[in-house]
Amino acid sequence: MLDQPIGVIDSGVGGLTVAKEIMRQLPKEKIIYVGDTKRCPYGPRKEEEVLQYTWEMAHYLLRHHHIKMLVIACNTATAIALDEIKATLDIPVIGVIQPGARTAIKVTNNQQIGVIGTANTIKSEAYKEALLSLKAGLAVQSLACPLLVPFVESGTFLDQTADEVVKDSLEPMKETGIDTLILGCTHYPILKESIQRFMGSDVSIISSGDETAREASTILSYKGLLNTSQEAPVHTFYTTGQQQNFENIARDWFGYLPGKVETVSLEHVYQQ
């Protein structure tokens, strides 16, 4: 059980930002990653579709890779599917919304927090509810940014157009008075430098990867599931879309290719 992998799932490449942090904090753990790039983005999809797709990824990892923990490294999937999956599976399941909310509350000075995310994440008000459940009286400004996920998935964030897309998307958030901005989508940290430039140095930018990895570490330790092997872990990354594009983005984000990349088909893997 100890040497079984951690499963990380996302609608595409965004969850790589979380996987990278888990690999940094838990260097002995093996990661099996599934990015549903073929059906990305999840943000504008119907809730029942997001639930179905998230279950397909989870079921694939359980059946074929016998994971010991599932990390839903997608804010949209966390908002829609976390509670059901967590209540159903007998392994630890964590999402990215609560960790991000906790971090933002630690950082803010003026108690004004902004949240950017996909249409579904913002519509769910999952971040607002998480923030206010942890600390009453916060002022929470939310903004859907539907252009950012397709932009990251296309790989064109590697050129100068990133600043323009960020400006067009975040303009309404600029003058709200927030001092802390939650990147409520795991794709967004890939654009963090552009977002920081646009929002200014006086706004703290929060991504949930660090806190999510810390939560994974705490839970695995508490349950006695940390890998004690001295062998270097071998990570595997699966994409439902274009393998080469996934590899290019992964290589850019990590600075190297952190494991083998393969394609996988998830349709009809799981039927509710």
Curated annotation (Swiss-Prot):
Pfam (any one): Asp_Glu_race
Associated pathway: Cell wall biogenesis; peptidoglycan biosynthesis
UniProt keyword Isomerase present: yes
Any GO BP: cell wall organization
Residues that bind substrate: 10-11, 42-43, 75-76, 186-187
Family per similarity comment: Belongs to the aspartate/glutamate racemases family.
Purpose of the protein: Provides the (R)-glutamate required for cell wall biosynthesis.
Record protein name field: Glutamate racemase
Species name: Bacillus pumilus (strain SAFR-032)
Chain's gene name: murI
